[in-house]
Amino acid sequence: MTNRAIDDSRSLLTLGRVDSVRVQVGYRASPDDQVDRQYLLDLSVPEPDGGGGEDVLDEREILAALEPVLYAGAEARRHYSLHQHRWHTSWGASPGALEIGLLVNTGPRTTAVSEASYDGVARAFRDVMEVVGRPERTPTSRESAVQRTLRAAATAYAVDPDALSLRAEEHHAADNSWTLTLRSTAGDEYDVVVGFVEGYAGAVSVRHAHRIEAADSIGPE
């Protein structure tokens, strides 16, 4: 086979630079169990100084920033599943995206483990924002919060957003965050917090609550 030097500037197929980053972290008791809580972070990558097309984002720095999520209250890191996806389109604004998905196995999902998981993700997401570029904090409207809630639940649990209805909502103005509850036509509930990291709307947590079963109002005979 003949080796050929590759000129990146003339390549027809290229992934280009990374324009956006999505990180998704989920926790479950074991690989055979369902994920009970997911955390999503969506970030835009700032243009490099000088406006060049080079990719200045180091993916290894993002993975290093995510390491705190592996502990979830334990002294040693827990087992995990990691996948990474990169895509790019050649038309329009030619966006390039990097997606990182991480599932962590914690054993029994106790309250202490859940709280430690939350703290680890919040710390890791702050570090990822420093690596990628800290976004400007802007007020999140109710409409934007509802749309992000629907998209987050659909992304995290592969549910049809048209099958979800809003059951409850609460606005935390001081924190620039929203807490909303969705219910599917199948009876599943999703508790969503938009802006759980420093009020940034692109940081969303989704908890899959137990299915609501219809109760017999008469009771057993």
Map each language-model feature to its residues.
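Hydrophobic transmembrane signal anchors and adjacent membrane-proximal interface regions, especially
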Residues: 15-27, 89, 100-106, 112, ...
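Amphipathic, membrane-active segments
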Residues: 120-178, 189
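Ampiphathic alpha-helical segments that act as solvent-exposed interaction surfaces
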Residues: 56-73, 105, 109, 206-218
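C-terminal assembly and membrane-engagement modules of membrane-active proteins
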Residues: 167-221
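Short secondary-structure junctions
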Residues: 70-84, 161-169, 201-207, 211
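Short, ordered beta-strand-loop transition motifs
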Residues: 31-35, 92, 169-176
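Membrane-active, amphipathic/fusogenic segments and juxtamembrane/transmembrane anchors
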Residues: 1-88, 150, 154-158
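Membrane-inserting effector segments that mediate pore formation, membrane fusion
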Residues: 73-137
